[in-house]
Amino acid sequence: MKTLNKAVARYNGISLIVRILVGLIIGAVLALVAPGAGWVGELGNLFVGALKGIAPVLVFVIVASALAQGSSKLDRRFGTVIWLYMLTTFLAAAIAVVTSFMFPVTVVLADAAQSDVVPQGLGEVMGTLLTNFVANPVSAIMSGNYIGILFWACMFGVAMKKIGAESTKVFLSNTADAVSQIVRWIINLAPFGIMGLVYSNVSSNGLSIFTQYGKLLALLVGTMLFMALIVSPLIMFIYLGCNPYPLVFRCLRESGLTAFFTRSSAANIPVNMALCEKLGLDKDMYSVSIPLGATINMDGAAITITIMTLAAANTLGIQVSLPAAIVLSAMSALGACGASGVAGGSLLLIPMACSLFGISNDVAMQMVGVGFIIGVVQDSVETALNSAGDVEFAATAEYHQWSKQGKSLPEFLTGKKN
């Protein structure tokens, strides 16, 4: 027993990032040496499943508890967060238009993807998003509908604040703390989960996607990296007035890296909340803004929809005018905000955007098929960009408020001791 305790202590004594990198390397090596060891891949499935399973419960109890205690203050910070989420999503779509014009690509169309749930227009996408607000609360938790979870958690928390006994509020607070502890245990096992996810990806996909669709993939990933490393930091600098890169790299390292392998913004919500706690953010604030960001902060989705649509237009020889490109940017940004309410996410919103240029649904669905082929890389980078951005802008709004109040920013950001 002592030996086991020592092993656990040594494991916990190593930085989580170092452990994840070791797991990543081991997973890649195992995939090349023993590609038939399916049990390794199951570790990844278990990790993602655990995160997806606990995330809806975590969001509900934390938001409800914060409101029931009467300490939640959705002040100007919340408005700033929503503004930053929407602004960066639109800018991402606009930048995708610019890069597509600078580096136009055509593709070999794949077999059409099969789906019965392709949205017919922007109205349907936004209608689905609004309908999700009032979905059955139990169903919302079971299906991971975070718009619905947020709505009912707010209703429950406000009602509990009004009529709940003090002992009930304490129980709700203790429940939130208990769920948060479970999340910490799950995240502590991330190296094994990442090892399994890397193993599955390397052993099943290899490098084949880079040969046939390399240019399209390079354009998508390059645009997302430009957004993550240039545009978002510039916006953060405007609000913070100091070098944003320590925060950017920390969010990419501690949020984006995990999101890259889980390929799920929902699964990464617990990871992001743990990171917000480390950054010293207000729990009452980030408990709402992080789940909301997983729904509407969709820079990567806006880039994917825009570039894939313009690639389809280039393939068919359709000339896209500047006004049409601006309309596409707005449509992609709004559609991306509703991507979480559509089965298949950003890829199945491509036909909606293609309809702007009169591209047939058959061709649009072939582009969706291409998307699924390159998805192992495209979707990974997209999710990493989206998820890291959730924390970046929640922190930016919070630290901006600190500056206005004369409060010192964190030492890691300014390099000055407080």
Task: Briefly describe each language-model feature range.
Residues K73-V81, Q181-N188, K278-A294, L322-P323, ...:
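Membrane-interface alpha-helices at helix entry/exit sites of multi-pass transporters
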